[in-house]
Design a protein with these regions (language model features):
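N-terminal secretory signal peptides that target proteins for export/translocation
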Residues: 1-10
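Cyclophilin-like peptidyl-prolyl cis-trans isomerases
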Residues: 24-214
Length: 214
């Protein structure tokens, strides 16, 4: 490096300064985090606001309205997913806001412990229901999905993986016509924003929506 022209050294040093400043800015800009208090323990999730802005804003809106409080994890399939966010303890679906755009093309994968949106067979039908992947479910990624749309990943579990794994092992059966329902209800007692989400808007007036089914 001693033989490089001085002007080149200037650019290199300047580049390192710029990179260092950028990394510092990234450290300051933290992703939103949400705590899910369940009857099996607490689960903390980090939301990928940059990669899935519409989906994250939608999820935070439901959190702020208290939509998730008192809902159950109504679909549990070991080695696949834990799903919740839309059903009451008596297996009635809660009213939701309008469906959102499917952001599954954001490059994120349905890897173990990622947080994704459930939907019907219609690609842009996600509302409030979400699921946590219990393994890498590659067929749910846009690149490998049969419908060429896939299921949007918008966050990941950063604390409480053992709680998710515990939920995955509960006994399930058919309840009021629905399969894979925990026979002992697992309740999401409360969802609360921990940080980084103060600016998320509250969605419009809720309306009825079809049952979400991944």
């Amino acid at each position: 490096m001693a033989n490089w022209p001085r002007c080149m050294l200037k650019h290199v040093i300047g580049g390192w300064i710029l990179i260092g400043w950028s990394l510092g800015s990234m450290a300051l800009a933290q992703n939103p985090r949400v705590l899910l208090e369940t009857t099996k323990g607490d689960i903390e999730v980090e939301l990928f606001e940059k990669e899935a802005p519409v989906t994250v804003a939608n999820f935070l809106s439901y959190v702020k309205k208290g939509h998730y409080d008192g809902t159950i994890f109504h679909r549990v399939i070991d080695n696949f997913v834990v799903q919740g966010g839309g059903m009451t303890a008596d297996m009635k679906e809660k009213p939701t806001s309008d469906p959102i755009e499917n952001e599954a093309g954001n490059g994120l994968k349905n890897e173990r412990m990622t947080l994704s949106m459930a939907r019907t067979s219609a690609p842009h039908s996600a509302t409030s229901q979400f699921y946590i992947n219990l393994k890498y479910n590659r067929p749910l990624d846009r690149k490998y999905s049969q419908d060429n749309f896939g299921y949007c990943v918008f966050g990941k579990v950063i604390k409480g993986e053992e709680v998710v794994d515990q939920i995955a092992k509960v006994k399930t059966g058919r309840v009021k016509g629905n399969g894979d329902v925990p026979l002992e209800p697992i309740t999401l007692k409360k969802a609360m924003i921990l940080e980084g989400a103060a600016a998320a808007p509250v969605a419009d007036t809720p309306k009825d929506s079809p049952q979400k089914d991944k």
